Amino acid sequence: MNNPCIHIEKARQHNLKDISLDIPRDELVVVCGPSGSGKSTLAFDIVYAEGQRRYVESLSAYARQFLPQMDKPDVEKIEGLSPAISLEQQSTSRNPRSTVGTVTEIHDFLRVFFARLGRMYCPSCGRPIEARSADEIITDIMALPQGSKFMVMAPLVELQKGTHQDKFKKLRAEGFARVRVDGTFHTLDDVPALDKNKKHSIDLVVDRMVNKDGIRGRLADSVELALRYGEGRLTVHLPDRPEGERDIIHSTTSVCPHCHISLPAPSPQLFSFNSPQGACPRCVGLGTVDYFEPRLIAPNRGLSLNTGALLPWAESKHFQRYEPALRALGERHGFTLSTPLEDFSDAALACLFYGEDEKGRPAAHSSGLRRNWMGGNVAMDATGDYQSELFAGRAADVKVSEERWPGVIPLLEKGMQYGEAWREILARFRQSTDCPDCHGARLKPEALAVRVDDLNIAQFCSLSVERALQWLEGRHFDGRHALVAEPLLKELTHRLSFMRNVGLEYLSLGRAMATLSGGEAQRIRLASQLGSGLVGVTYVLDEPSIGLHPRDNERLLGTLRSLQQRGNTVLVVEHDEATICAADTVIELGPGSGSQGGEIMFQGSVPQLLRADTLTARYLRGDASISLPDERREPQGWLTLHNVTTNNLRGIDCRFPLGVLTCVTGVSGSGKSSLVVDTLYKHLAISLGQRVDQPGTIAGLSYSEGARPIERIVAIDQTPIGRTPRSNPATYTKVFDEIRNIFAMTPDARKRGYKPGRFSFNVRGGRCEACGGDGQIRVEMHFLPDVYVTCDVCKGRRYNHETLEVRYKGLNIAEVLDLPVQQARAFFENYPVLERRLAVLEEVGLEYLRLGQPATTLSGGEAQRIKISRELGKRSLPGTLYILDEPTTGLHMHEVGKLIKVLHALVDKGASVVVIEHNTDMILAADHVLDMGPGGGENGGLVVSQGTPEAIVADPDSVTGRFLMQERRDRLKRRG
């Protein structure tokens, strides 16, 4: 292009302050700065949005209505744009049908690969099934050794009762001479009488031959005749071979000659779990089914039936309705309504949950129910399968009587039929598990019966990317198959190699996208873009290094450089030092966050940045650094997970210290999230009566002697605090409740009879009804993006005139919501509760946020710190466990220091904190480190090292320790 730069003039979007700049094209450009300084606004809301908007505008009006419309950014001029592609973390698919394979489109090539190159095997007996033409069958027979004796036979009857005399008579009339009956050869004139009550097998002998030159014509006639009588099947009998090897069965159809199971011809649709042709009928291609989990229905086994042990009925009238029937059940099985569930016998528990049969016995197999319900492995033996089989068909017939108890779970299954509202209520008592038909493979048996060498498509998708590449490299095909295989193998290996290059070699293609971190999902899309081979595009990425161990960063940087060298502009929002230092151009925004940011502090090369006086430059040079704690806390006890086998974890016993800040580290795919999120968090959540999906597999969970058990568990992530502009920091932290109470107590409000609800913009009364309390009105533009205009009635203040007349200390409610946290704290200094909550927001570094700032404008880091502030506002936190997965995402080095102080403040209040993190500052600031590894995927799953950061550094087996050692050397040099 003629323009070597993307030229931006007077950008005022969000908090940007009329900035103008030139972003070099065809370079790797990194945008850095504090959280909320305007980085994402510049990269995504201006460069990407305008590039995408202009591309969409170039299409016809008809095409535009099917594409998402981007808002026009608030900027005076943008020139030099190219089509833009956004790779954000927030767009991780929650669709249960999206997998790594489908998103990267590798699965599409795999479906063709297995359809064209796969061989069918009988799902019942496992024998190969191959539809062959008559010519191919003749060629196979003539390939027998010269001089081989053989018979061409047509199978007529297989294991069918009857005398079959009519069939023998008809064959004699048609001129045939010999048959084989139940393995013995006879002429048609001396076939013995057959017992009509026994099953018989009959083969017609069409021809007897010796393999030699010149027999092809005769053989062709015999094969054609045998296939006609055998309805597409024939048997070649070799009498000179050993017993059991004499019969070779051929078929012109995809039918197992032994089991008579017919299989459809392989097609790409057969291997799609999103197609009715391929999806498992039971789970409709999801791979999982839901069932009612007894541990969620009755999480507190110390309660009795009449004290609310059964949560679905604890706060409703259902228990009173079922009380007579339950009392009668207790008389039959030795319990009363006052007996704690933990004192029930196994049979009584099974009857309570699954009902009784006609003889008063448990309707479901109760083996393992007590063990699992009391806190062991989550898998409920066959109970999930039992529910689906038994109750799906008869839920409508469930009846309650004193003579026979139908079971709590059948009654809840019946409730699932009462409509969507009931299903939502009952959802928290249900659990997901692998589909018992396809065992999580998502596909029909017919699709799984097709294999290439030793693997079907589901088995291939369960391999790690690294193993999948090795398997493909070992495949060799001949003849026609080689021509088909060559382009498919090339495309598959290329795309898998791209995934390996971005550090995702440990993932499997069957992994659900919903289970991936934002960083992993973004790198998957990055790998897809590498495979597309586009040039002249502007790629906009949001912290691609998130989720990557420092060991894997180099490969990621190589990938970004590869994109740039193809002739693309790569614009990266990033805080990682290595990525910043690898950039061609660095743009730093600041100086602060929110209203204190939005200015360009620096633009230039990395050497120029290192000489500049900016916040980022000071940290890169070592002039500023994050202080480390002077001493490490001692654990207040231990929580142990026994024999953890979740995902790639290898039966480990893992000890978590209580009352300290613990950092779980390790290379990508080593098992950190499997251990902390899927196992620790989910099992503790279930024990506390919370609903979670498919917790990891463990043998048990225990506490050390004297340790205080976890009584509350909180996962603090970076998801938004609200999905609409109505949500804001004031509403989330409950500050708004106090503010509304204060306004309701003013003389003006009391005189007018205004209650606190009058000062809410979410309900009628005080809000502006013209805009519904939004302050904006949406104008539909049909083929253009919707436009939001400030409400003419309230002028964007959300409230009606009468409400705004009420003032406190000279400000009305709208003006108070427009105050930054720092000013609001001084404004409400006479209200201790309010002042304390605002002080906590300041402590976590959010003093610049406006109280009423819409949640949709907050960054992930800001949202996370608001959540932490709400927890810090609680007076005491003993017995609470906080789990954070990569909390430094989106945070500048300066803000990481603030976050570390906040997490230590949680521990000082008596809480335990477990953090999954790669950031070396966070690791060095922890009391305890648990390092997973040694590699990723199948090479991980072990606890490599555990102890203080100093112990990890001293451990030669720890990859993390080596990076920590280098970091400590750098820190000492900076302090020098």
Model segments located where?
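Conserved phosphate-binding elements of NTP-dependent enzyme cores
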Residues: M1-G976
